[in-house]
Amino acid sequence: TELFFKKLAGYDTLRLILCEKAILVEGDSDELIVQRAYYDHYGRLPIEDEIDVISVGTSFLRFLEIAERLEKPVSVVTDTDWSLDALEKKYQAYIGENKKDNINICYDSEMDEGDHEINGKAFNYNTLEPKLLKANNRTTLNNIFGTNHQSDNDLHTYMKGNKTDCALKIFNAEESINYPEYVKKSFE
């Protein structure tokens, strides 16, 4: 872990060390959605409460090692992806009987399935975008995106191909949306 962080640019590591609390997310779209969900809940952005939302890619565990040593309050917002068992194994040092007081792993334990395919590959219903559609509806998201998708599967395809644009439109939207429970759990 020390070698990893020595090679890292350092800014996100410094952000984790200096913040009062952190919410770790995988990418830009997750960061925008968490920021907006927090804003819709509290009427202000997380940074105004000294909570830094940090995009860490797939390096969650390395950041959690630092948070654990510093006893830094941290939530992780992560996709379940294809396997709940694999996710729970990955975070076994931080959940269940191993849960740390300062670390909160937030994910949807309900596995969704469907028959949608994109370019001949099965669609993953257990990422943020399909969970956003599930928490809302096609009409709401079509209105925010300025689209007119006639089926949930068409909207799934659009959202998967335009993750950051969709998240940015949600972030900037005048109206609020519903958020998956695991996203809200990261800051409530």
List PLM regions with ranges.
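Acidic, Mg2+-coordinating catalytic modules of nucleic-acid enzymes
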Residues: 6-24, 28-188
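Conserved beta-strand-loop-alpha-helix hinge in the C-terminal portion
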Residues: 1-2
